[in-house]
Regions:
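Conserved helicase motor core of SF1/SF2 NTP-dependent helicases
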Residues: 8-10, 23-178
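Short, Asp-centered acidic motifs that coordinate Mg2+ and/or phosphate
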Residues: 16-17, 36
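Short beta-strand and adjacent tight-turn residues that come in two discontinuous sequence segments
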Residues: 20
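A substrate-engagement module of RecA-like helicase motors
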Residues: 1-16
Length: 178
């Protein structure tokens, strides 16, 4: 059932799942209405907004990766209130400590040779490649001299300088190797 106004909500109708924006959760009509509030992409939600949303529940589950997308728009809040809720909660830790939450430690996107590097550099060595990701490889054409392996991270030096927004030199190399 779609609601155009949060004031139309009747939780006596047996609603099991309710989705809404931060603004909907901050509405006084929502006070203590939810058993749990799941905040997806919590790295994009400021502490100030999370505090406002928290009036709807006693249990909050933050979901997301603080290393990915940051807040799309940032308000000016005093102290730490403007930080993303994940950054604030993690207190500069790269990954969630076991006593504070659950890290989904498997990825089905990254080939193991890429994942191993990313895991070591960004995720405290706690991320692993799973499933069919090991089969994600490049087919290298015989005349290609730039790409020397089918999977992993490879440095290809390109001679250019001062390109901050676009690089024709990089585009040319990509065209050559693709």
């Amino acid at each position: 059932k779609r609601l155009d106004n949060v004031k139309e909500i009747s939780f006596s109708e047996g609603i099991k799942v309710f989705g809404g924006t931060a603004w909907a959760m901050c509405n006084s009509v929502m006070k203590d209405k939810l058993d749990y509030l799941f905040v997806d992409e919590a790295g994009q939600v400021s502490v100030a907004n999370l505090v406002g949303m928290s009036q709807a529940t006693k249990n909050i589950v933050l979901i997301g990766d603080q290393m990915q997308l940051s807040q799309p728009a940032k308000g000016v809040h005093p102290g730490s209130a403007g930080l993303s809720s994940l950054k604030f909660f993690l207190d500069d830790a790269a990954t969630i400590p076991n006593d504070k939450g659950i890290l989904l430690s498997g990825t089905h996107r990254l080939h193991p040779e890429i994942c191993d590097f990313i895991s070591a550099e960004v995720y405290d060595g706690r991320l692993s490649s799973e499933g069919e990701a090991k089969n994600r490889t490049l087919k290298i054409s015989k005349g290609n001299k730039s790409i020397t392996k089918e999977a992993g991270i490879l440095y290809v030096p390109i001679n250019h300088y001062g390109n901050s927004q676009a690089s024709l030199e990089e585009a040319d190399i990509i065209s050559e190797i693709s």
